[in-house]
Curated annotation (Swiss-Prot):
Keywords: 4Fe-4S, Amino-acid biosynthesis, Branched-chain amino acid biosynthesis, Iron, Iron-sulfur, Leucine biosynthesis, Lyase, Metal-binding. PROSITE patterns: ACONITASE_1, ACONITASE_2. It comes from Bacillus cereus (strain AH187). This is 3-isopropylmalate dehydratase large subunit. Coiled coil: none annotated.
């Protein structure tokens, strides 16, 4: 019987197996940020240990950074976490993309763009959305603070091998429908626990047609379905994306041969298989308080089925049977590790070019990294957004989570390109609706959600 992509990735990294069936995995890349690392570094200090492989560790500042005035950090805890990371990286000789550094940005944006993320690697980070890097054929997953310390000290991690889930995507997406809509559809149909105990492998003709940044969006939200990770087999697009980046390997012939061996064999069998035809897929909007509470833009909000629905409707200030077009939008956030890359900003800019943000709507565009921001500005995207009435910010996690000054006021609705819509995620009492960059941009213009399939834009920007 053939092997799945998961099998090949796992077997390449097993150092030892214990009597309980746990495998000790070697970790090829450890990404670090300011929120989940302080206790881990302190643990090293207390036990008189060093970081075993500083060269396989890379840190950045992202969660706590203000995106309007990056140096004006008024929150005491946020400032302490940022200062502590700076001190820890200096003491333990860990590379750090500090505030203002050209390599700084959201950890799951800078990994790929710097070439740190590569096919075949095991990648961990003290962050839920580490699965993003699986788009490159890497086995990438989030870990807890105690595990962060273990990896810092040993460059290994004890893990139980998950099962493999195959998710085949067939068909061509309509104009105005994107990878974000695919993952929101998957979650709305199968729920937030469908992937529990599994690694999701996305494959099929739809995946083959996707560019790398769309693939990253899919893998980023695999965790929202309960999966350990999301992975996609590397192909020519993967290699083309990685090639030439700062930390990418120079011996491409050797690496390409190994990378192209990373695929699921034709006779391999998944532990669970799902097939989705995306041909008739519509843009999605979440209405509730977890990412599976979503509907097509052309559907009414569902009936209440249990106490969770009851609570969600109450928190969101919405009602069963309500039209998605009638959901008010007071805030728009285009950013996060899910949708803050250059192509995301280009799509949003195409929607708003020559138009104006609806009066009473506050709209933010927060690039995922310094490099994304610079590239967008070279193409003039900042002018398009600012002329439309958007705020153009510095890179950071921003309004994805309530850990910095960018928050949604209590009781107000936000169209957000982020990945989580839990109660209070964007601030106390904030009401979050997860959507694609196109849907968020369009909502800023109308003050409510509209069907981006019917918008008269071509999805491309002319820079002449």
């Amino acid at each position: 019987m053939g092997k799945r992509l998961l099998d090949k990735l796992w077997e390449r990294h097993v150092v030892a197996t214990n009597e309980n069936g746990l495998d000790l995995l070697y970790i090829d890349l450890h990404l670090v940020h300011e929120v989940t690392s302080p206790q881990a570094f302190e643990g090293l200090r207390l036990t008189n240990r060093t970081v075993r492989r500083p060269d396989l560790t890379f840190a950045t500042m992202d969660h706590n950074i203000p995106t309007k005035d990056v140096w004006n950090i008024t929150d005491r805890i946020a400032k302490q976490q940022l200062d502590t990371l700076r001190e820890n990286c200096k003491q333990f000789q860990v590379p750090l993309a500090d505030i203002g550094d050209e390599e700084q940005g959201i950890v799951h944006v800078i990994g790929p763009e710097l070439g740190l993320t590569q096919p075949g690697k095991t990648i961990v980070c003290g962050d839920s959305h580490t699965a993003t890097h699986g788009a490159f054929g890497a086995l990438a997953f989030g870990i807890g603070t105690s595990e962060v310390e273990h990896v810092l000290a040993t460059q290994t991690l004890w893990q139980r091998k998950p099962k493999a889930m195959g998710i085949e995507l067939k068909g061509k997406l309509q104009k105005g429908v994107y990878a974000k809509d695919i993952i929101l559809h998957l979650l709305s149909k199968y729920g937030v626990a469908v992937g529990t105990g599994y690694v999701m492998e996305f494959y099929g003709e739809t995946i083959q047609a996707m560019e790398m940044e769309e693939r990253m969006t899919l893998c980023n939200m695999a965790i929202e379905g309960g999966a350990k990770a999301g992975i996609i087999a590397p192909d020519e697009k993967t290699v083309a994306y990685v090639k030439g980046r700062k930390y990418a390997p120079r011996d491409y012939e050797t690496f390409e041969k190994k990378w192209f061996e990373l695929y699921t064999d034709a006779d391999a069998i998944y532990d669970l298989h799902i097939s989705i035809d995306v041909t008739d897929l519509a843009p999605y909007v979440t209405w509730g308080t977890n990412p599976s509470m979503g509907v097509r833009i052309d559907e009414k909000l569902p009936e209440k089925h249990d106490v969770n629905d009851e609570r969600a409707f109450s928190y969101m200030g919405l009602s069963p049977g309500q039209s998605t077009y009638d959901i008010p939008v007071q805030h728009v956030f285009i950013g996060s590790c899910t949708n803050s890359r250059l192509s995301d900003l280009e799509i949003a800019a195409a929607v708003v070019k020559g138009r104006k943000v609806k009066e009473g709507v506050r709209a933010l565009v927060v690039p995922g990294s310094k490099r994304v921001r610079d590239a967008a500005m070279q193409k003039g995207l900042h002018h398009i957004f600012e002329e439309a009435g958007f705020e153009w910010r510095e890179p950071g996690c921003s309004m994805c989570l309530g850990m910095n000054p960018d928050q949604v006021p209590e009781g107000e609705h936000c169209a957000s390109t982020s990945n989580r819509n839990f109660e209070g995620r964007q601030g106390k009492g904030a009401r979050t609706h997860l959507v694609s960059p196109a849907m968020a941009a369009a909502a800023a213009l109308y003050g409510h959600f509209v069907d981006t399939r019917k918008e008269s834009y071509d999805g491309a920007i002319s820079y002449s």
